[in-house]
């Protein structure tokens, strides 16, 4: 059994190669292809949360996969946007929600929201990193935490 430090060093030594291995996994490839093919069709908050695969992909990318079931909560967070300091998401202490709303800021950007790189490739990059961390954590939780 490889210890936490050694596992972490193996992954971190060539993070690019590690991410390439993750992106080559069949399930990751399928979900990423679906996301990139369909995210451009999303024009509203409702469109995003109604497409279960797109919403789950975006949530996982931001480390929020455990909250995918809470669609009403996420709709409330997105409807308030991030520009108003009194908005719902700005009152939350977990930065992941703010990052999610920033990436999918329909309040500020309207229908153009999903045309931005941070919503397309930026979300894919985060998804790959999150998947890498989760996969590493399956065998050693310490490695997942170190990669985070």
Regions found by a protein language model. Name each.
Residues 1-48, 53-148:
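General marker for long, soluble alpha-helical cores
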């Amino acid at each position: 059994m490889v210890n936490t430090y050694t596992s972490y060093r193996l992954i971190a030594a060539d993070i690019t190669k590690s991410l390439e291995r993750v992106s080559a996994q069949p399930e990751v490839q399928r979900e990423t292809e679906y996301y990139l093919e369909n995210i451009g069709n999303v024009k509203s908050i409702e469109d995003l949360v109604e497409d279960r695969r797109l919403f789950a992909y975006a949530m996982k990318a931001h480390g929020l996969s455990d909250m995918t079931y809470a669609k009403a909560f996420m709709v409330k967070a997105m409807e308030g946007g991030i520009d108003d300091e009194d908005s719902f998401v700005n009152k939350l202490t977990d930065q992941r929600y703010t990052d999610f709303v920033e990436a999918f800021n329909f309040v500020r950007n309207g229908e153009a929201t999903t045309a931005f790189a941070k919503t397309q490739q930026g979300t894919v990059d985060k998804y790959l990193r999150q998947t890498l961390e989760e996969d590493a954590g399956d065998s050693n939780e310490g490695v997942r935490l170190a990669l985070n």
